[in-house]
Amino acid sequence: MLLINKQKDPVFQFLAGTFHQDIETPDDAIQELLIEESKEYLEDAIVFLTDFIESEHSDNKKNDYIQSCADGVYLPAFNLEPIDWLKNVIVQIKKSLKKFKR
């Protein structure tokens, strides 16, 4: 697993804060995030999540980190690797931000 100070890591804060064990479904958690968070935070999230995905850590380490942080999501149910699931989350955030620009 990545050795990151989780308390200061925005990726950890995003995943653990959004996809914790008390969520109903991951889709509900994303919708809640898109409604409650500011446009600026969502724009920042795209940047730090993309930076994480493009980092030099191995995909296995990234997948393990995502899985440990997003403990409210049963990722095998999506038939995707955790990193691919996170890429889909970024796409959903980007689609939501397009609505802000209208």
Swiss-Prot record:
Pfam families according to UniProt: CdiI_2
Annotated InterPro entries: CdiI_2
Top-level lineage group: Bacteria
Disruption phenotype annotation: Deletion of the yxiB-yxiC-yxiD-yxxD-yxxE operon has no visible growth phenotype, however it is out-competed by wild-type cells.
Name of the protein in its database record: Protein YxxE
Natural source organism: Bacillus subtilis (strain 168)
